[in-house]
Amino acid sequence: MTVNRDIYIVLTGTGTAFSGIIKWFTKAELNHASIAFDSEMREVYSFGRKKVYNPFIAGLIHENFIHPFYSSTDCAIYQLRVSEEDYDTMYNHVQGMMQNQERYKYHLLGLVGVLLNIRIDRENAYFCSQFVASVLEETTVHPVAKPSCFVTPEDFALSLNAHKIFSGKLSYYMHLSHTAALQSSSLHNPQATNPADYTAARLRLHEERAEGII
């Protein structure tokens, strides 16, 4: 029997000055990409600022979405079902990088290369969406048909639109996923519930109420 697992591509727009500069060039609202290995967003990785309030020190990071920095962050979350083998390959690849975290730097020149459509390689350096795409390249999962060095967050938004499970405030998603986790562990609800499925259902209900359907 084939066992499948879920990974999540998370696009965010933090509203910082650096994010605003990228937005000016890309014309996209969400300009940061991350890969998550659980629906509760406890295992989220990307390339970005290592200190929340210092954009000049950046590299490989394990993101903490419950930090107040993300309280007003907009996001879109995409769920991809992959084989257990592909899941393990991606997760182990990222964990291997995390063991040498200080070796990896943010590839600012790579962003310039994307804008100019010129490949600019730098050893052990990535920008956020390049990192996410490169992790996917380790497997059979290739949602964006271009080299990782040219992949932007907007490319994920366009190619994964059918897989979107949430769009809105990241803090609201975190609240819903936390509620789902509590429900699934409750003695009154022993049957486990995937927090992402629960969150998507809650979001649909919220939208239907807003439209007057319910």
Per-range role (PLM):
Residues M1-I214:
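Cysteine-nucleophile amide-bond enzymes
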